[in-house]
């Protein structure tokens, strides 16, 4: 697939998987992930840990009102796997570095770090549009945290997920079909 399609191995794996499965499976999973996405938006942006039912309903309403092509991003199978799911994965990624900036280490065990490195490699390969900017933002948040605490050694383990994410992004970008976009003689099929 990387040779003739594109390098989005992870996202297009899910697209192909759910296109072959009964539609109800995708619909239920996507509804769950949408609720999880809204909850994560609230978690990252909220200054308090209290839950507001008003905000929980206001956020999706605002997405519905102000998101261009709402149906293509949140409802259409291919669109939501490529866009909404990538936004959710971006929030999961950034949550680690935002929590670190707020003084809470979420990668305190080795298995968590290894799992997060695997996740960031897959996330780096997920979407050209989202992956680079989010990984770079995570890097900047890590640098700000190191600067605030005047230490590098304590936060050095947080560099590994950034490297894994960059490696996943490079696999996406340097795939034969992906690199053809940047060549002087693009391949046409």
Predicted regions and their residues:
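Transmembrane catalytic cores of multi-pass membrane glycosyltransferases
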Residues: 1-24, 28, 77, 111, ...
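Membrane-interface micro-motifs in multi-pass membrane enzymes
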Residues: 8, 55-98, 127
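Membrane-embedded alpha-helical segments of multi-pass membrane proteins
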Residues: 28-36, 80-93, 135-136
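Transmembrane-helix motifs of polytopic, lipid-linked glycan transferases
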Residues: 31-54, 92
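Transmembrane alpha-helices and membrane-interface helical segments
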Residues: 39-43, 92-99, 137-146
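Membrane-interface helix-boundary motifs at transmembrane edges
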Residues: 42-52, 101-109, 145-156
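Short hydrophobic alpha-helices at membrane interfaces in multi-pass membrane enzymes
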Residues: 99-122
């Amino acid at each position: 697939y990387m040779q003739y399609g594109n390098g989005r191995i992870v996202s297009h794996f899910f697209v192909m998987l759910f296109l072959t499965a009964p539609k109800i499976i995708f619909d239920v999973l996507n509804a769950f992930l949408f609720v999880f996405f809204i909850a994560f938006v609230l978690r990252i942006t909220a200054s308090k840990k209290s839950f507001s039912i008003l905000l929980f309903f206001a956020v999706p309403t605002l997405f519905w009102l102000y998101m261009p092509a709402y149906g293509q991003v949140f409802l259409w199978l291919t669109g939501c796997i490529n866009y909404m799911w990538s936004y959710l994965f971006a929030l999961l990624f950034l949550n680690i570095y935002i929590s670190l900036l707020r003084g809470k280490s979420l990668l305190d065990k080795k298995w968590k770090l290894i799992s997060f490195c695997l996740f960031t490699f897959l996330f780096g390969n997920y979407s050209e549009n989202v992956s680079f900017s989010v990984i770079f933002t995570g890097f900047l948040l890590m640098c700000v945290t190191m600067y605030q605490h005047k230490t590098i050694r304590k936060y050095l383990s947080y560099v590994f997920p950034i490297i894994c994410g960059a490696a996943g992004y490079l696999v996406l970008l340097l795939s034969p079909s992906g690199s053809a976009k940047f060549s002087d003689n693009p391949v046409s099929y």
